[in-house]
């Protein structure tokens, strides 16, 4: 059956968008952030001081202390049948960063560096190694930088320059089915 272009183009477009969203895993109900591999923002702050300082003043960071006290969050939680915002997976998945603390999964921060860039335990050492003991980001060779980026990404880091992976990760929370 042939549909007129005016009908088939939007249908194809919507089908493509649904397929893209499905491929991000947003309908799976969880994100690929493994609490056993989460570090914390301090680990990132060793090199990215200004970024971590900016994050600490951001809505993403302050979610940890502000959201559980928010009336809007309490109203939403009540409608969803959630009693404790910091312990229900529907909230934890997007609004907090969880890590292993004393052999239990616990929220340690709001939406952190690792929420966007992936749990760091598997890639942070490679990401922060510039070649040799005395090498810095300024003295690192282009070949080493390229290899460092590739190895970090293969280990789970989501770099800002990888727009598809970054957007797919963002949409994991910013587009939800409920």
List each model region and its residues.
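N-terminal secretory signal peptides that target proteins for export/translocation
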Residues: 1-9
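Sequence context of c-type cytochrome heme-c attachment sites
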Residues: 25-109, 114, 120-164
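Non-catalytic accessory/assembly modules
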Residues: 164-171
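Solenoidal tandem-repeat scaffolds enriched in leucines and small polar residues
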Residues: 172-178
